[in-house]
């Protein structure tokens, strides 16, 4: 059995969007599962719209998702001489021809066909003209498609799909300026790169019969095709910017983890029983193109958020700490060296944080020298007895050998018993003094992470400011 070869072939006219990322993921997974090759090809024949900035954004997005490639990136713009060579081969074989019809003439033909209730398609005016010198007139090159019979393929997702050849146009494969067209270069690239399986969006279904006819005319193997249903917004319209962020990297900047995005994207159309949580390693073992559904997937931001919260909650604190640094810098924390160890801080927050933004916001107070105190909390939890309670607590904390959460909890119990009070009469005031907020990580965990010295400083600052 020959090696499977799959490719992802984005156009560099923008960022890596969610739909493109899912297509790349499906191709990558099948290549990895079948121990094949995953090829990255940049389809930049639209020179006017293609930018290096977009190329960089696509590569960055794939790298962030963990989708490495075995070959490439290849650029179609490097292959214009090759495409020209194949155009000339088809003309010489009588399988393509020069068409001299002007845009105005074609528009007249189109309007006539519509008026007569027919399907607008080229009427073949130049199909059988002698293919000698073109005497300087502008022309396009058209593929001479068969006019009879049926073109079909067994789609790996959608099943058998067929088109009557009489319905297909004589496809333009080279424009008047000599540049090749999309449907033609895709076939040449896939053929010369030995691509065996093409997984792409189902907006390409109508291109497929035309491309199959080109493969056959070139006498090269036709790959297998799998057309993935599109992704819809909540209103069941095609996912677009009006539904929110569609760029993969925008989700990174919003505090989503790559493993959450990968997990979510693969479940947009693919299933494996009732399982919801998959690592990339799991997916390589379990993924199959046959289990991709035929119905469109609806993008659900809440489900993505749920997955992200799961991965933060169960993530390695050291890794999360490294990912957190850029978000802290955005919030003015440029150096965490003077504060508590960041992985320890993460441990106190990851249980509740849904995004890295929430994690960063929650971590901020650990590294602030001057806190802003919640006014309602101060009015509710600070009173004339508070200074004595806070100082009494600190004195007892100082007598503990090692500040562990268990030891700290014991100190609070001892203080409450000694003063004849409940935890609710001292705990909220301590929380406010240490974090400035009525909502924070657990009090015992906070004290353990801040350490005795910093805890004492914060208690005294709060007493000085609030009592």
From Swiss-Prot:
GO biological process: glutamyl-tRNA aminoacylation
Localization terms from the record: Cytoplasm
CDD domains: GluRS_core (cd00808)
GO molecular-function terms, A-Z: ATP binding; glutamate-tRNA ligase activity; tRNA binding; zinc ion binding
Keywords of this entry: Aminoacyl-tRNA synthetase, ATP-binding, Cytoplasm, Ligase, Nucleotide-binding, Protein biosynthesis
Primary residence: cytoplasm
Gene Ontology cellular component annotations, sorted alphabetically: cytosol
Gene3D superfamilies: 1.10.10.350, HUPs
Enzyme class: ligase
Keyword Transmembrane: no
InterPro entries: aa-tRNA-synth_I_cd-bd, aa-tRNA-synth_I_codon-bd_sub2, aa-tRNA-synth_I_CS, aa_tRNA-synth_I_cd-bd_sf, Glu-tRNA-ligase_bac/mito, Glu/Gln-tRNA-synth, Glu/Gln-tRNA-synth_Ib_cat-dom, GluQ/Sye
Quaternary assembly: Monomer.
Family: Belongs to the class-I aminoacyl-tRNA synthetase family. Glutamate--tRNA ligase type 1 subfamily.
Name recorded for this polypeptide: Glutamate--tRNA ligase
Lineage of source species: Bacteria, Pseudomonadati, Thermodesulfobacteriota, Desulfuromonadia, Geobacterales
């Amino acid at each position: 059995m020959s090696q499977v070869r799959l490719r992802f072939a984005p156009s560099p006219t923008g960022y890596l969007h969610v739909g493109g990322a899912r297509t790349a993921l499906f191709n990558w997974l099948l290549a990895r599962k079948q121990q094949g090759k995953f090829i990255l090809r940049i389809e930049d024949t639209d020179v006017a719209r293609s930018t290096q900035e977009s190329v960089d954004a696509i590569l960055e997005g794939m790298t962030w998702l963990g989708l490495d490639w075995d070959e490439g990136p290849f650029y179609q713009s490097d292959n214009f001489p090759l495409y020209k060579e194949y155009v000339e081969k088809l003309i010489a074989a009588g399988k393509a021809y020069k068409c001299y019809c002007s845009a105005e003439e074609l528009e007249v033909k189109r309007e006539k066909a519509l008026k007569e209730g027919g399907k607008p398609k080229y009427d073949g005016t130049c199909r059988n003209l002698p293919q000698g010198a073109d005497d300087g007139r502008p022309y396009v090159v058209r593929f001479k498609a068969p006019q009879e019979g049926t073109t079909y393929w067994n789609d790996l997702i959608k099943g058998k799909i067929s088109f009557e050849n009489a319905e297909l146009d004589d496809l333009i494969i080279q424009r008047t300026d000599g540049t090749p067209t999309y449907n033609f270069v895709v076939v040449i690239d896939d053929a010369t790169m030995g691509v065996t399986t093409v997984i792409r969006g189902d907006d390409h279904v109508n291109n497929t019969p035309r491309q199959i006819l080109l493969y056959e005319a070139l006498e090269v193997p036709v790959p297998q095709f799998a057309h993935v249903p599109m992704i819809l917004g909540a209103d069941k319209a095609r996912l677009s910017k009006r539904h929110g962020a569609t760029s993969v990297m925008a989700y990174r900047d919003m505090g989503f983890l790559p493993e959450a995005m990968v997990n979510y994207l693969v479940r947009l159309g693919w299933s494996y029983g009732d399982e919801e949580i998959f690592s990339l390693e799991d997916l390589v073992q379990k993924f199959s193109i046959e289990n991709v559904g035929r119905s469109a997937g609806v993008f659900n931001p809440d489900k993505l958020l749920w997955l992200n919260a799961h991965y933060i909650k169960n993530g390695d604190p050291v890794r999360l700490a490294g990912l957190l640094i850029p978000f802290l810098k955005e919030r003015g924390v440029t150096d965490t060296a003077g504060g508590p160890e960041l992985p320890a801080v993460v441990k106190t927050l990851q249980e509740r944080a849904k995004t890295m933004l929430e994690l960063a916001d929650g971590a901020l107070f650990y590294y602030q020298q001057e806190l802003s105190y919640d006014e309602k909390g101060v009015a509710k939890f600070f009173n004339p007895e508070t200074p004595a309670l806070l100082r009494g607590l600190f004195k007892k904390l100082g007598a503990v050998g090692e500040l562990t959460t268990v030891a700290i909890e014991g100190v609070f119990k001892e203080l409450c018993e000694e003063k004849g009070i409940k935890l609710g009469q001292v705990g909220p005031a301590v929380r406010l003094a240490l974090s400035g907020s009525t909502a924070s990580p657990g009090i015992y965990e906070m004290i353990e992470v801040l350490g005795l010295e910093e805890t004492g400083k914060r208690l005294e600052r709060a007493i000085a400011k609030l009592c």
